[in-house]
């Protein structure tokens, strides 16, 4: 399998249907806690615009590598600007008070070099005293929830299955998605996509953040700012600052 960056071109059509139970309110609580007085924000991997649309910030920009996602976001959220771009090499020619990358976006950085490039890009696009917030899957989650597990979901118009297969690299996973979208009456159209994710050890993330120029302000797990990183957490959060 090649490590092409997944673009969610087909899944974007049903993305919101199967993310309606995602705890976006918890991400928003964290963003608002650390960004009480921000005047500009950049969302890396902004998807269909759910997070930015919920924020009351004067200047809001989102980037995503899926043009279909960007088009949907533009329709959903006229209060923000959205661009199709690569998180490892974007250049927007402006800087922001806050940058966010929610819902394990950084796990789509296919290797440590790509992960470091995202951090360096974020640093370059932050104002002085700016904050970068992101989360990643934990080692525990990669080894348990994504260890040949099969998931499925459906509603009246869509059915999909999601097979997880551990990748060749340590702490990596292939997501094989198959979904059927109703087009009329009993006629369904089948789509298939394969996505690759890689997570990174806490010590490696700290090193890459330091190399990018960041100060590590805080780290915690599972949406609780008072919850230290633990071996059985599912999602780790990082709050980085450009001083």
Positions of predicted regions on the chain:
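Conserved class I S-adenosyl-L-methionine
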Residues: 1-47
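A short glycine-rich, Lys/Arg-flanked "PGG" loop and its adjoining helix->strand segment in the class I
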Residues: 116-128
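Class I SAM-dependent methyltransferase SAM/SAH-binding core
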Residues: 48-89
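C-terminal lobe and adjacent flexible extensions of AdoMet/dcAdoMet transferase-like proteins
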Residues: 202-243
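A short SAM/SAH-binding and catalytic strip from SAM-dependent methyltransferases
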Residues: 97-113
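SAM-dependent methyltransferase
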Residues: 133-206
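A short acidic, Gly/Pro-enriched loop at the edge of an enzyme's catalytic core
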Residues: 88-98
